[in-house]
Amino acid sequence: ETGTEELTAQNIVLATGARARNLPGLEADGDRVWSYRHALVPPHMPKKLLVIGSGAIGIEFASFYNTLGAETTVVEVMDRVLPVEDAEISAFAKKQFVKQGMVIMEKATVKQLDRAKDKVTAHIESGGKVETREFDTVISAVGIVGNTEGLGLEALGVTIDRTHVVTDEYCRTGVEGLYAIGDIAGAPWLAHKASHEGVMVADLIAGKHAHPVKPESIAGCTYCHPQ
């Protein structure tokens, strides 16, 4: 079917999710350069893998494919892997990753990817020098961005902070009757946080008591080895 339909409601909940962030020159193509979505349904098993970014998404896929036998290199622009964790946790995790055969490059940046039919040449800057390394697969794990475009939110006066909708602890956007839940509402990008937000907003709309979202109370986990 085609055409436009206009709907009216007292309350509207935005739950459009998010997508992988693409950086210029590092865009995923689904062939040799993957986003997290491609890595979930891989077209081939990597033999020599480069993972750009060492947040939860990057480390989880690095750990997974390394366990399956891929020679895995992780490049992180910050001074330690898993930079949102405590420093001692990052240090312990890095030690274990190296023992497992991973190559960890911290304070390093992938400046350019040269793509060929069966390989990708990465230009990696580290310590003021640029070196080239070859891989058959690259996973770009440099964050996610909320799907805020094409919804007319700016015209309504909804505040957008870079890549997500700004909400209060009850997921209210500041526009009467308009809520935002899940990844479009920003970090932490966790399924159980989104589920709680959905239940909470449903309770609010139904006139029931609702427990607000408290970021400091949201448990998080990076599914790697060690976990």
Predicted segments with their positions:
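Glycine-rich nucleotide phosphate-binding loop and flanking beta-alpha elements
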Residues: 19-21, 58, 81, 145-148
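Rossmann-like dinucleotide-binding cores of NAD(P)H-dependent redox enzymes
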Residues: 40-41, 46-50, 56-131, 188-195, ...
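Generic beta-strand/beta-sheet core signal
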Residues: 15, 75, 107, 140-142, ...
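Core beta-strand elements of the Rossmann-like FAD/NAD(P) dinucleotide-binding domain
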Residues: 2-11, 128-137, 174
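Generic recognition of long tandem-repeat/solenoid scaffolds
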Residues: 1, 121-123, 165-167
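Short glycine-/small-residue-rich Rossmann-like dinucleotide-binding loops
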Residues: 17-18, 126, 139, 143-144
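Glycine-rich dinucleotide-binding loop and its adjacent helix/turn
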Residues: 16-71, 75, 100-103, 154-170, ...
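FAD-site-proximal beta/loop scaffold in flavoenzymes
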Residues: 29-45, 132-212
